[in-house]
Amino acid sequence: MMRPVLFAAIILLTLTTTAPALVYVEKKGVLFYFPENETEIAAALTEKMPEFISFLAQKGLAINHPLHVILDDKLDEPQVKVHVIPHREIRIPLRAPGVLEDGYTRENPWAYFLFKGLCLQGIYGIRSGIPGVLHKGFGDIVSPNVIIPPWVDDGICGLLYAKYRGIEIQDPLEAAVFHASPPPDLDIISHHPQIWPGYHGYRIYGKPFIHWLNREYGWSKILEFLQLHGRGIVPFEIDLKAIKVFGKTGAALWSDFQKAYTREIPAGQGLLITGYWGEPFVYWNRAGVYPGKIQVRQRGRYGYVEPDGTLWVSQYDQMARLYKYSKGTVVSMDFKPVWDPGPGRVAVTRLGHRPYLIIFADDARGGFRHARRSDRDHALLIAAPAGVIQLPGPVRDGQGRIAVAANTAGNWDIWVYDDQWHRLTKTPSIEMDPWWEGDSLVYASNLSGKFQIHAADQNQLTQSAYGAILPRHGKYLNLTGRGWKLQNYKLGQVAFAGLAYPMDARIEAPAGHSPMETKPYTPFKSLWPNYIRPDLFAAATDLQIGIATKSRDVTGNYIFDAGIRYSFDTNFLALGAAIQVRRIGARYTRYPLSYTTALDQTVDEARNEVKLFWRPIEEKTISIEDLLRAADGLELGEGLELSVNWRTWKPLEGEGSYRDEGWAALSFVKHWGILGGWGNLEIFTENRQSLSLGINLLFGDQIISVMDLMAGRAWGEPTLGHTTFRIGGNIGEGYFTRNPSRLFP
């Protein structure tokens, strides 16, 4: 009797855990969550949201409810995240985009991300026919339009935003790359992000393609295609739907688009560069670091290289952090958020949405080895000027002065900090990429209509045909039709003009908003899932069918899953349910276990298990919004877990009474770069113990190989299927046990 009472008490205790520091407002089926100290941004978004929804509805993109919108303090990646399960969700990064990142020219980038998220929700919500019928039974997991190429849905949302605002569809650099060469083949855009123009080719060419499609065929045809795709039972198939709507396949439409923008194919070959360092020459992009490791990551534009070639660069792993690339190894620093490391140990961080420069303690090599949480008290923080929402690419000279680009309502200028802030430029153009030249500065600007390198007095130093950016060590990136070429901006330059700051560096304060009536955060508004997933396992020995669902609240601190599965071979109905609140959780499972070893040892048991666990150390290895993509949302990703377990079992067939046993377990999972390890110690009653360990090694560049080693041992009297180590078995095992399917039933 005590065990069920204890189980219920722990569940109640976990459900009353203190909620995150979030508040929310609810209007007409839209729940908007945000940090309680970010009401200014939230108020502006809630004011604009009805207008956005109305505009999209007029275009045929109705927004389904309920809808959860999150202004996410733990998201730095410069793009909106949109999901339809376990609830309809739009996740907006609280960090404003850096220069050349999506949305960087928008007066209010959070409003731009909100519009884009609403647009995608409108596209994903279009379904009819067989998907419409299945949607009534299984929920939002039936959403064919989720499977649309990014150059289509990004292009559609870009077109609608441009129509709504009455602006150009592309930002200045996207337009420059687009006009530098003819559009490449569709295969390059869809499948080869390592080839020029790179990963963001879907943005560079998708927006003009949809704009051309709208001009040639009209918006009604684009909407008709979305509606037809939303009723298709083979969502990957596009060409037949395109023929029915446009009279041509998707490839033929792209070919017509290419013909409409025919240009001379440029000679020579450039490089695919996101960022670089001039001395020694090192460059990087999304695919990897050169020279160095080929590893796909979303890297920032700015970095710092030590004389021995050690590179410091920022990467977006949900939140931004610094990485050290040195001699084939990659090490991440645990201080976050931080991005854009530059010379002089300076980088950028934020408190809420407001950016700060941060100067880390000296590591004697000019690097960022003190970018650790344990050294945070030794770092110096410098707040951005009032009204500035982003400070990308800081560089610090020998005198301690820091030059940086700054974004004010979508306008970018160069600022200098020398114990106080000075605004060096004040133009409606985009100024970025500052670099010290002695006592003076150079930077990139599109003041002339194209990006060129300019001196501090705005004197233009380059005459690039398409664009010049990122001055470093006398070099700059010159845009060509086939990539970036490294050239010299110092040719013929004797000296650079000195710094002269305009007298007025004030920024007009943005208009205030009406006070908001908010409610304290509750997880139950978003915890209940909006879908049921059909489940099927078929093998020569068994057929199993069932349904399952998983969910989480918008913070990821509350996780729930449940499911049932029927086995025709064993005539057994398995079921499981679990909940986790922050670091504490509980699970119940009912499942069969039936196998025969090579030694003709047989286990046939019907089991019930209860597990209570606590994770004093847990590192999220996947982002909150991608939690459902893991094998199990409650699985220990990395860290330490202590658990208390209780099991009852009886023979799977025939008569027999229930027996029970209890045990305590200690589990760990840890990764050190390419090496990972795990272990599980179980201490049973009646003086029985069981230990299993494993390591895995990942190696290779473009093709990754994995080597796994496992070992195990049991002490005391071994109990078959309980404390014994076993390799082999049916991959269907472990569905509800959450133990590895080939290790330890």
Tell me what each language-model feature is.
Residues 170, 286-289, 298-300, 312-323, ...:
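A flexible loop/linker signature enriched in serine peptidases of the S9 family
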Residues 24-26, 51, 224-321, 328-331, ...:
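Beta/coil-rich, acidic/histidine-enriched accessory regions frequently appended to metallopeptidases
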Residues 255-279, 285, 334, 352, ...:
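Extracellular/periplasmic ectodomains of large secreted or surface enzymes and adhesion receptors
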Residues 588-603, 611-616, 623-745:
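C-terminal outer-membrane beta-barrel translocator/porin domains of Gram-negative envelope proteins
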Residues 85-89, 94, 102-109, 113, ...:
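Acidic/His/Gly-enriched intrinsically disordered linker/tail segments
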Residues 259, 267-270, 490-590, 612, ...:
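Outer-membrane beta-barrel initiation region
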Residues 21-143:
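Juxtacatalytic substrate-recognition/specificity segment
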